[in-house]
Each structure stands twice: as C-alpha cells, then as structure tokens.
Amino acid sequence: VGDLPSDLFSVVGFTLTERLSELFHGCLELASTNPDVGAGEVLEQQVDLVVWQDGVPLRRFTGVVNEFARGDSGHRRTRYELIIQPPLWRLGLMHNSRIFQTQTTDTLVRTLLEERGIANSVFDLKRNPQEREYCVQHRESDLAFIERMAAEEGWHYRYQHGSVDGDEQPGLVLADHHGDAPRLEPAEYNGKAGGSTQQPAVFRFRYEERVRAASVAMKDYTFKNPAYALMHEQSAASANQRQDYQHFDYPGRFKADASGQPFTDAKLDALRNDASTAHGESNRADFTCGAKAVLTEHDNPTLNRDWLLTAVIHTGKQPQAMEEEGGSEPTTYHNTFSAVPADKTWRPKRTHRPLMDGPQIA
C-alpha cells in the first residue's frame, strides 16, 4: 500500500468485481500487528495485490484506495478494510459543464483523461470517429460524460491491472472491437470437480439465450438537405426469435451518413449485448474481463468454443493470516464469471443525456 512497508498488512480475504465498461470494485480484508494505521496513510494510495499458488505468482491486482476502515483488535492483530478502484474513479468526483467544438470523440476523451492525470490510456479503435461540430458536457461528472460519449461511439473500456513480472503496466484501454483482446490458455471444463480441484478448471458453466431487439432504425435531419431521409437501419440474424422487434429512435444524434451507420450498428450490438450469455465458476486466477478463452471438454460440443469474458468476480480467503485467531480453514481462491460468444461484439448500453431546463444565458 503506497510507500508503507510491504509486510505491514496480511491479506485475510478479498473480493474484486470487474466488468466491461464499469469501474472495478475491490474489497480487501487485512490484518496488521500495528493498531495505529490511520486513514491519512492509506487513502488515495496505490495498492498492489498479488495472488500466489505454491510459490508462483498467478495474478496481479492494482488500484487506488478510496475507503478505509479500522476494525476490532484481537490478541495481536487489528483488522482493517480497504476499498480499491481504478484511478478513473476520481473522474466520478469531478462535476462540470463545458462545451467542446470541432473535436473528434477520441480527442475529447483524451483531453479529459490527461487533464485528470490518467496518463496510461490506450485507444484501440478500428474506426476513426467523425468530428463533432458541437458537444456539451452538461451538469454531469467527467466519468459520466466519458461513458456516455464512449457508448454512443460503440466503445467499451476495461482496466489492465498489469502483469506479475512488471512487463505490462496498469492502464486504461478503450476499444471499439475485441480483436486485440488478451488471449488466455484454453479453459478445461470439469463439472464433476465441484470446485474442489487444485488444477485450473471451469467447474460450473450455464448457457442462456434471450429475446432482444432484432433490428434498429435511427433517423435524423440535416438542414443542408431537408428532403434527404437521413435514416440508417441494421438487423441481427437470430433463428430463435421473431424478426419484427424493431427499435426506432429519432433523433439519432448524427449529422451525416459517415457517423449514422456506425451509431446504428453500435446501438443494435448494445441492445443485444446479453442475447447470448454464459455464466460459470472457476479457479482460474488469470480470468479477467475483456479477455478471450476457449472452453474445452464440455459434454455439449457446441459450447466448446471461444468466449469473451465480460465480467469476473474474484474471491480469495487466507484465514491463516490471523494466525492463532484464524482457525483451520485452508487458503482458497475462486471466481464467478460472465461471457458472450467471442464472435459477438459486446458494446455498452447508452445512457440518457442530461436534460437542460431551458435557455442558458452565457
């Protein structure tokens, strides 16, 4: 934790939830022989947590402390609890109203991130965003504004915690595709293990399908050519539902065909981002949202395919950290995860724009 001694805290347990296009949230239960650790020494400090197995580092989690709690003291140790989130969390505390003119969305987002000290960000975009003549952040946080713009463009974001060897540093990734997603080792399914196996495996896997919008139509108006039908449509082929479920929207918030079709495609993907999903449990510490892995050895061969992880909840327990107060329970790690077929493009749903009460006087 920050510049504090690395042996000051022992990890009793942790839970960390990460999802695409959401801030991850980690809760660390710690113990220390020092009963006098104060909030001022911990809040806003960088945290580095490494999961080990048999002396081998498996996974690294990094974040910033935004909550601190001191618990009870036992015979020799005092309990503490820390909440960690990515540095991007700070933008949720910064509320503003401003106007951006003649800028592309990636330039706009880069400006906000750099102003707030988020330097390690990567834009992995296949499509060059169109210039926005006029774009307003209105009575909303910097984070809400960035998430709104990203969803409109069809971008998702994820946080890289960094590698255990230090070759890959923590950072924010914004992307409009999953082609460069981290590739994990194949995940072997072992439903009979019931979570008791020490070998890396997926021991629960549930596949689901849902009826969702089958097509999207978006229309807007251009004063340059009022008679022109500025309308774009996109449909999704699905054999398991009716095809007449159309989502129509006006205005589509685009001024030209160059942005109208991508906006329409992105909206359909977002409305269908949970049409085909899977949920499971595993002991694979390397599972991280935004990564891809092939499932193997499942008794249903159609599920032995490539999957994109969209959410992972990591849980670890190490009661021995409390020594004489810890009992005889073993050290454990497991996770629950959500995934979609890797040939689908997962995109976040759009949020509503803030409403303006009336004319604003400059």
What are these regions (language model features)?
Residues 1-362:
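Amphipathic alpha-helical and helix-coil boundary elements used as assembly
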